[in-house]
């Protein structure tokens, strides 16, 4: 096995993928040919937290573009519009936590988020813990407005809408591929699901789902979209068999070849059979759009990969139509947001609150 640096930027310099960050790996001991091997491209995003619009480095509204503006679904739409036509065998997957984080959720709930996700054209989504912040009824309304499947194998609910709309997996027959979803089992302690909505062990749920798919279908290609966190993704990889590719979220973990990254993209872990499992995630808030080509063999193992997170900065154009829509949605809450309720002499930065004690957390808790 060896790592090599790609000679050219797959998606173009316009999307800020540096050549030294676009990494590909092929397994020398296996020969890749047309007999049962299949290549598919995955775009993935996680933990957007209602950042429909661009934002500053701290996650707040971008009021000083000269200091850098990042993310926003108008930039994501541009990247997809300009790259997906040349990657027809591709899936766009959402790893959850679209709710909670900006006025787009505080003011509108899930309404404008659903409109945006449908317009972007996601192929499937798993749920994050924050999707339950306003309870099962609100989540149910959101799910009924979506135009793509929702997958989470470890959610068991007696809520009629959740029970009907959330499935353990979804098969994409055009690719002979099944996508399995799971949600952190800590959700009841950190969000507000109904009493009749339960979260089981994600590792057991994924293995049971793999076994079900393998025993009832001819599908061998599997991928998991997991809102359980980077450490739990690695545990999932180690403690299961038959799964070779995981796209994760929840822990806001930066992976890749750039300053601040905590691991490689992908991270490779061996499963119970000693086979490799490839794990990717795309940080937070939509600052990065994950992108990776994966070649599966006939048994569903990953032969090769090629890709890197796409950094969405000022250099990435915004789709004008979607940005105009987002700007219009801002109107009703702009005056509300301007109401002064207090004053601070220091910046109450919340960007590190998930990793350590932070000023905003101290202010709220104390």
Question: Can you say where each PLM-predicted feature lies in the sequence?
Answer:
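Hard-cation-handling environments
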Residues: 292-295, 301-366
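Fungal secretory targeting signals
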Residues: 1-19
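Acidic, metal/ion-coordinating pockets
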Residues: 17-313, 360-365
């Amino acid at each position: 096995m060896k790592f090599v640096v790609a000679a050219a930027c797959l998606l173009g310099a316009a999307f800020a993928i540096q050549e030294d960050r676009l990494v590909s790996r092929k397994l020398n001991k296996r020969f890749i040919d047309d007999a049962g091997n299949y290549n598919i491209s995955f775009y993935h995003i996680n933990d957007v937290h209602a950042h429909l619009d661009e934002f500053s480095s701290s996650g707040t509204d971008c009021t000083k573009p000269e200091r850098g503006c990042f993310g926003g679904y108008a930039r994501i739409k541009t990247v997809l519009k300009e790259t997906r036509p040349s990657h027809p065998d591709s899936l766009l997957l959402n790893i959850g936590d679209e709710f909670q984080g900006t006025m787009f959720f505080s003011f509108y709930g899930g309404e404008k988020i659903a409109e945006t996700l449908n317009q972007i054209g996601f192929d499937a989504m798993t749920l994050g813990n924050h999707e339950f912040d306003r309870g099962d009824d609100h989540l149910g309304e959101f799910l009924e407005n979506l135009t793509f499947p929702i997958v989470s194998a470890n959610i068991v609910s007696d809520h009629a809408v959740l029970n009907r709309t959330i499935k353990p997996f979804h098969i994409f027959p055009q690719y002979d591929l099944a996508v399995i979803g799971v949600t952190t089992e800590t959700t009841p302690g950190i969000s507000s699901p109904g009493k009749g909505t339960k979260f089981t062990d994600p590792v057991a749920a994924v293995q049971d789902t793999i076994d079900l798919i393998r025993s009832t279908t001819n599908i061998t290609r599997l991928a998991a979209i997991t809102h359980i966190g980077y450490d739990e993704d690695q545990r999932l990889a180690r403690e299961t068999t038959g799964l070779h590719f995981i796209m994760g979220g929840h822990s806001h973990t930066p992976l890749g070849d750039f300053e601040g990254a905590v691991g490689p993209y992908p991270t490779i872990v061996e499963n119970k059979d000693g086979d490799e499992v490839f794990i990717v995630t795309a940080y937070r808030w939509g600052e990065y759009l994950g992108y990776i080509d994966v070649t599966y063999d006939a048994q569903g193992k990953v032969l090769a990969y090629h890709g890197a997170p796409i950094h969405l900065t000022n250099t990435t154009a915004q789709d004008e139509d979607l940005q105009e829509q987002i700007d219009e949605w801002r109107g009703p809450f702009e005056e509300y947001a301007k109401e002064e309720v207090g004053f601070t002499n220091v910046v109450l930065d919340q960007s590190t609150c998930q990793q350590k004690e932070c000023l905003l957390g101290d202010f709220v808790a104390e």
